[in-house]
């Protein structure tokens, strides 16, 4: 059984990680341990580079905290070009896989508050009245009328980032 350390305690992210690992490696093939680690970037990262750095930093910090794991996974959400997206970084002892998620264009009223220094999650909670929306369906769930959720978009990116770990052509 794979010991997978999730560099987050966010339920939406953990669900995506667990579902993707089960789909790739088989149902029940992994145990997810979630840890809270720092990203080393602002709470609301801006740009692809800063967001990816946050995910890489979380993986590095999770590896230091739980060096005995088989995999370390981080999902860092950010804002880029008026849209929200995330970077997924997965490492094992030998390699790294990375993937960027789909992007969701954000309305001007939301972007204005985020650009003033507020994080997207709290802004969306104020807008919708849903407490801790970032730990649930997220802006993605709200603006796609539930057709997608934060977790479903993360799930796809985790699947993509896992590609080097189960396809021999990457080795």
UniProtKB/Swiss-Prot annotation:
Query: One GO molecular function term?
Result: ITPase activity
Q: Which key words tag this protein in UniProt?
A: Hydrolase, Magnesium, Manganese, Metal-binding, Nucleotide metabolism, Nucleotide-binding
Q: Which SUPFAM superfamilies match?
A: ITPase-like (SSF52972)
The record describes how the cofactor is bound as:
Binds 1 divalent metal cation per subunit; can use either Mg(2+) or Mn(2+).
- UniProt key word NADP: no
Q: Which residues bind substrate?
A: 8-13
Give me the residues that bind Mg(2+), please.
38, 68
The cofactors required by this protein are: Mg(2+); Mn(2+)
Name the reaction it catalyses.
Answer: XTP + H2O = XDP + phosphate + H(+); ITP + H2O = IDP + phosphate + H(+)
Any one of the GO BP annotations: thiamine metabolic process
> Which Gene3D superfamilies does the record associate with it?
3.90.950.10
Tree of life domain: Bacteria
Enzyme nomenclature, EC number: 3.6.1.73
> What Pfam families does the entry give?
NTPase_I-T (PF01931)
Does the record's keyword annotation contain Membrane?
A: no
Give the InterPro entries listed for this entry.
Answer: ITPase-like_fam, Non_canon_purine_NTPase, NTPase/PRRC1, YjjX_NTPase
Q: How does it assemble?
A: Homodimer.
Q: What does this protein do?
A: Phosphatase that hydrolyzes non-canonical purine nucleotides such as XTP and ITP to their respective diphosphate derivatives. Probably excludes non-canonical purines from DNA/RNA precursor pool, thus preventing their incorporation into DNA/RNA and avoiding chromosomal lesions.
What family, per the record?
Belongs to the YjjX NTPase family.
**Name of this chain's protein:** Inosine/xanthosine triphosphatase
């Amino acid at each position: 059984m794979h010991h997978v350390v999730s560099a987050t305690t966010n339920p939406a992210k953990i669900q995506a990680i667990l579902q993707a690992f089960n789909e790739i490696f088989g149902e029940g093939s992994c145990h997810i341990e979630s840890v809270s680690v720092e990203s080393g970037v602002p709470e609301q990262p801006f740009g692809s580079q800063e967001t990816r750095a946050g995910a890489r930093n979380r993986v590095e910090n999770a590896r230091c905290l739980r060096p005995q794991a088989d995999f370390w996974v981080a999902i860092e959400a950010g804002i880029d070009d008026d849209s929200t997206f995330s970077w997924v970084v997965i490492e094992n002892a030998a390699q790294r896989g990375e993937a960027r998620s789909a992007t969701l264009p954000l309305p001007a009223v939301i972007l204005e508050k985020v650009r003033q220094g507020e994080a997207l999650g709290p802004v969306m909670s104020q807008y919708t009245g849903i407490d801790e929306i970032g730990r649930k369906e997220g802006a993605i769930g709200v603006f796609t009328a539930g057709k997608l959720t934060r977790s479903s978009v993360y799930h796809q990116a985790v699947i993509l980032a896992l590609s080097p770990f189960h396809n021999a052509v990457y080795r």
